[in-house]
């Protein structure tokens, strides 16, 4: 009878040990699942980034092709052709704008507005599409200066296209860049400041939205795992903005932005703002 407590104690210790081992196994399994989930997340983000790099590369290839045609029209003194090409070629650049930070000093060389250059007291260094835009749409002329500007533009477009494969594009840049771009559209671009001479702003807006939407679509599979409701909200708001932009289609292009009323501009701005809010939460895919 005196041995019974010893046996009971041994049994208790054995059961406790089994319980501890079970708890340890649970923790180990959870750790493995967590590590596996993180590994899958990392692989998914890398895949999305690679796909976006291909997308950007393709857009910049088309931007260069279009710029070559645009410059050829200027060299041929073909004002009508140059004006026809101007907004359409720029769309390739504007679709890539979420990651324009990675373009370095080529971005201002290609896309700076006169107001930006004046603010920095560098108007004498102004180059790019908007300088030529002023010649075509405000000055209504193509002269030797315009042709010289066109040569520089083509040189910069070629350099950017050559750099496309080496651009430092990351998930963080894609996510933050798309949000920053939409903020810019809803607060400053909406005023018509970018295409101040040509009034082709709606082409830019459409391309900016398409560029941001491409990023969303690439991250969507991972976002659906993390927050389906957020993903659906983003999609709904993209649809709303695109429906509003479709109202201003004119053939294969868009109406002159000067024809868009103040009220309609506000509606468009509000819609882009409503999109930007859930889009800013998309960084959850990196967690």
Swiss-Prot record:
It is a lipid-anchor. Keywords: Cell membrane, Lipoprotein, Membrane, Palmitate, Signal. Its main location: membrane. Coiled coil: none annotated. One of its GO terms (cellular component) is plasma membrane. A lipid is attached at residue 18 (N-palmitoyl cysteine). This is Efem/EfeO family lipoprotein.
